[in-house]
Amino acid sequence: MARMSRRVFTLSALSVLAATGGGAAACGAAAPRSGTAARAAAGRPAPEAGRASRAPAEMRGVWLATVTNRDWPSRPGLTAAAQRGELTAHLDKAVRDRLNTVILQVRPTADALWPSPYEPWSECLTGRQGRNPGWDPLGTAVREAHARGLELHAWFNPYRIALHADPTRLTASHPARRHPDWVVPYDGRLHYNPGLPEVRAFVQRAMLDAVARYPVDAVHFDDYFYPYPVAGQTFDDADAYDRHGGAFGSRAAWRRDNIDRLVREMAAGIERVRPGTRFGISPFGVWRNAATDPRGSDTQAGVQTYDDLHADTRKWVRENWIDYVVPQLYWHIGYADADYAELAAWWAETARGTRTHLYLGEALYKAGAAEEPSAWQDPVELSRHLTLAAAHPQVRGHVFFAGKEVAADPIGAMARVVADHYERSAKPPR
């Protein structure tokens, strides 16, 4: 969570973050919540954390990334029939592996995999941004997933505009070209400025259009809020800070508040547009290192979401702002800088006593990859993750990155997970 350090998650970004020890908020009164939290607020009890609630229900998910045609479609420009065929093949493979949820990336770069009145058709479909593919991928995905007993979670990236820095390459009608003041170039990419209230309102309208049109089971964000930091570069939001940051003691605090507002307003919008639809986020796996904050994990990660992405993921869980969280724990058991075992325990403790469901993001893409250490050459590594996580009652399941690896399973790591842990089908938690 696409998750990841999701999140998408491009493999190049994941590799850079891994090399640095990484992996791939204060708004006043509580906003209305979607899904589980809304039901609890209405006086209906949320399921208690613990083995009794885990037994009949377990998240078994897969991310299906569309950015750069990572997982689907296999390449741009396929016929509508070929794209449908590839999509249903992914859904069928999920059913065969006794998974129960597909998290489909439907807004990878400020574009759309449905006929949006706000943003252009995604170039991953036809190779040309704005070109109608001749069918409705998101509508079809929801219908075909539900026909197979799968949940379909719509995965959106809120602020990424493009994986390049040239606005003229965007289709002429793109909102970023109509509002160049909304755009911040950074790290060779284009980003919407999270510090502008008009940007935050716009991206919510664009995303909620899909929720209004289709009975998606959940809305899903990945790990990209403010962009991952790049040495020697500055994300230029000084003008927005001068206009809107006066109430904050630092730009970092203001930025965290901007992301907090996005999360809370989106939760309220989902509940307003389609009540009962859940809202989940898949952050980078380290909130803060304990050396930075005693509440943090015993890790030495090069990226900390609170400080670097300005995403206070711990608070979102502790204060029940979201229905589920899927931290991207894309490291092996025993990894010195970010041990999977340490982080699984830290997130379990963070979720303890909350209504936020905890699922763990799993780096299936690393299994058998030549550049990965020996732990990832063992097809049993991921199965060990699930065995270890079962000792924490707060862990209600796992999501695998990503669809291409579920389909190919080069060293049999997914097959081992299925054989060891997914002998019978399971419904996703509600």
Question: What does each model-identified segment do?
Answer:
Residues 313, 323-335, 354-429:
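Substrate-binding cleft of secreted/luminal carbohydrate-active enzymes
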Residues 153-157, 220, 255-303, 357-361:
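Aromatic-lined carbohydrate-recognition surfaces of secreted/lumenal glycan-active proteins
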Residues 278-326, 331, 335-339, 343:
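Substrate-binding cleft/loops of secretory-pathway carbohydrate-active enzymes
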Residues 65, 69-81, 159-209, 307-308:
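Active-site-adjacent "subsite" loops/lids of carbohydrate-active enzymes
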Residues 114-126, 160-186, 224-246, 291-301:
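Aromatic- and acidic-residue-enriched segments that line the glycan-binding/catalytic groove
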Residues 85-110:
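Catalytic domains of carbohydrate-active enzymes, especially glycoside hydrolases
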Residues 108-156, 251-266, 273:
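Aromatic-lined substrate-binding rim segments of carbohydrate-active enzymes
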Residues 2, 7-30:
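N-terminal export signals
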